[in-house]
Each structure stands twice: as structure tokens, then as C-alpha cells.
């Protein structure tokens, strides 16, 4: 009897979700320029993620971060886990392997080439570093990632005092043109279904539990690249 009542409550919640969705606009947590799968790639490299956000980019990080000098990128140490850039690079490399297979340059090769690049934080930007890396590796496209929030949850999968929160932007650059042909931003702090019924789809897609920051990051990558 109790189980039947729980199912009824769940069905009502889902029904209300669709009703409310028709009356309100869902807050965007994923912003992406469509067409990633349509970009023809012969040889692609994933540049190691960069950590940071420029103050002037807070309102529009998608369009400005790529051209911000490295020295002007900053982040709150409490907002970004220490090795967030390394974790994100690994997660995205794994996801891109499924999409690009033989066209994706192995991570050790990219890491070695990136380490050899001369770097000048006062003048270098993520865009300029990506183009230099692409030329060095003879890649026609380079994926660039910038992470500016990576907060771990406080609690467990069943109960969390503070949820995980992850935010990052991705760009796919055409090396010859030096410009992005695709870009996307993921910015999400997990919410309970009881807090926002409009998030029901994401709530169930995430397993109806509180995710770790790593799990939320993987979820975000899947959302933006359409895996």
C-alpha cells in the first residue's frame, strides 16, 4: 500500500513537471552551438584544460574566455578543485575517443607537445596556445576547455548538505582559420527534485541521487557533446 502511494506521488510530480514546463521557461544550464557532429575532422587534439574566469566574462563567458590572456584568468580556490583541469581533460579525452576514434591524437602525445610550447602568460590566450599546439601536432582541429567551477558535494549520494557544482566552456577551433567552429557551456549546481520540478528530466538522468563533482562533470560533458 505504501509503495503504491509512493508511485502515485511520483506520477503526480512528473505530471506537474510537464504542466509547469508549458507555463514557464526552463533555466538554461547548457548552452551550445549545434552541429558538432557535422564538423569534418581529420586530426584532432584536446588541449589540456585551463582553469579560470575573467571578471568581465562573468556575464558572457562563452564569447570572451577564449581570447582572454592567461595572466588575466583567475578563480576562487574554493570554487575550483585543485586538479579539476587534469580531471576534465581526462574525462573529455575519454568522451572524444568514442566520437573521433582514430582521428583523436593520444593524450600523452598532446601533453608532451603542449609542455614544449613556449608560454608567455601576459600575452598568451587559450586561443593562441591552441593554434600553436595544433600546428605543432599537424592537427586541423583543437578542442579547448576552460573550467571555472568544480565544487565537490558535501554529504553522500542519499543526502547532501551542499551539492556538487560544475561549470566549464568548450571550443572546437579550426587551426587554419584560428576561429571556433563550435562552442558550448555547461553550468550546473545539482538540485533536488523537490526544489525544482522543472529539473525532473536531469534529476532522473543523473540517477535520482546526489552526484560527486566528477560524476556531474562527466554528465555535463555528455550533455554538451551529445554523446
Feature locations, PLM:
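Bacterial N-terminal signal peptides that target proteins for export
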Residues: 1-11
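Bacterial N-terminal signal peptides
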Residues: 10-21
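A generic structural signal for short, solvent-exposed coil/turn residues
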Residues: 15-17, 36-38, 96
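C-terminal/domain-edge helix-coil "capping" segments
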Residues: 23-58, 133-137, 149, 160-227
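N-terminal segment of the mature soluble domain
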Residues: 53-146, 175, 179-183, 214-227
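Short, solvent-exposed loop/turn segments at secondary-structure junctions
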Residues: 113-114, 150-155
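Short low-complexity, flexible loop/linker segments enriched in glycine and/or proline
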Residues: 120-121, 158-161
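Short helix-to-loop capping/linker segments positioned immediately adjacent to catalytic or ligand/cofactor-binding
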Residues: 131, 154-158
Amino acid at each position: 500500500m505504501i509503495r503504491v502511494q509512493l508511485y502515485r506521488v511520483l506520477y503526480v510530480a512528473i505530471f506537474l513537471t510537464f504542466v509547469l514546463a508549458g507555463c514557464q521557461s526552463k533555466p538554461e544550464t547548457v548552452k551550445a552551438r549545434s552541429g558538432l557532429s557535422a564538423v569534418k575532422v581529420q586530426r584532432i587534439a584536446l588541449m589540456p584544460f585551463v582553469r579560470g574566469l575573467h571578471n568581465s566574462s562573468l556575464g558572457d563567458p562563452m564569447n570572451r574566455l577564449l581570447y582572454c590572456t592567461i595572466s588575466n584568468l583567475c578563480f576562487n580556490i574554493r570554487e575550483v578543485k585543485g586538479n579539476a583541469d587534469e580531471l576534465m581533460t581526462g574525462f573529455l579525452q575519454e568522451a572524444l575517443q568514442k566520437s573521433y576514434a582514430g582521428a583523436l591524437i593520444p593524450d600523452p602525445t598532446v601533453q608532451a607537445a603542449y609542455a614544449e610550447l613556449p608560454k608567455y602568460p601576459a600575452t598568451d590566450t587559450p586561443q593562441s596556445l591552441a593554434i600553436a599546439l595544433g600546428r605543432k601536432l599537424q592537427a586541423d582541429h583543437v578542442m579547448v576547455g576552460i573550467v571555472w567551477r568544480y565544487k565537490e558535494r558535501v554529504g553522500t549520494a542519499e543526502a547532501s548538505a551542499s551539492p556538487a557544482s560544475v561549470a566549464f566552456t568548450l571550443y572546437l577551433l579550426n587551426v587554419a582559420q584560428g576561429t571556433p567552429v563550435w562552442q558550448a557551456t555547461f553550468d550546473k549546481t545539482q538540485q533536488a527534485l523537490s526544489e525544482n520540478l522543472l529539473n525532473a528530466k536531469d534529476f532522473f538522468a543523473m540517477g535520482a541521487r546526489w552526484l560527486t563533482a566528477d560524476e556531474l562533470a562527466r554528465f555535463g560533458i555528455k550533455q554538451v557533446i551529445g554523446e
